[in-house]
Amino acid sequence: MSLRFLLDTNILSEPTRQHPHPVVMKKLQEHEGEVATSTTVWHELRFGCSRLPDSQKRRFLERYLTQIVRLTIPILPYDVEAATWHGVERARLMGMGKTPSFPDSQIAAVAKVNHLILVTNNVSDYQGFFDLDVQNWFQ
């Protein structure tokens, strides 16, 4: 199978919730082998986990990240091609008076240059990016 989707932080976090959203879980199973994430999302996940105090929850999340996410989901880099698209797109959006967050812009760039559909629960964070396909698996 080839990659089709780039998962945002809130999608990759969903399986760790006490009561994960059933549609998200179904989609993750349906599209196993077709999903990737970005180094920016990996950073957000590791940062969030690392800020937690030493606890059972933190150890659970660390295992999830290292034994599930890291081993089963490709983590695509924010590379020169993504940085180029990001720079041009950020300038265009700022010229229109819009200022998307830098990390969200990086995630959008990785999805765009890899021709992937960005999957997120925060669709509004990605509105305005030129020709970016976005899906919300929570709906």
Question: Model-flagged regions — what are they?
Answer:
Residues 39-41, 79, 122, 138:
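Residues at the C-termini of beta-strands that transition into short coil/loop
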Residues 14-15, 48, 86, 129, ...:
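Residues that scaffold the ATP/ADP-binding catalytic core of kinase and kinase-like folds
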Residues 3, 47-50, 74-119:
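Active-site neighborhoods of divalent-metal-dependent phosphate/nucleic-acid chemistry enzymes
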Residues 52-56, 92-94, 136-138:
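Short, hinge-like loop/turn segments at secondary-structure boundaries
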Residues 1-37, 50-66:
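Short, well-structured N-terminal submotif of metal-dependent ribonuclease cores
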Residues 12, 42-45, 83, 126:
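A generic structural signal for short hydrophobic patches within well-formed alpha-helices
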Residues 2, 108, 112-139:
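Acidic, PIN/NYN-like endoribonuclease modules and their adjacent C-terminal/linker elements
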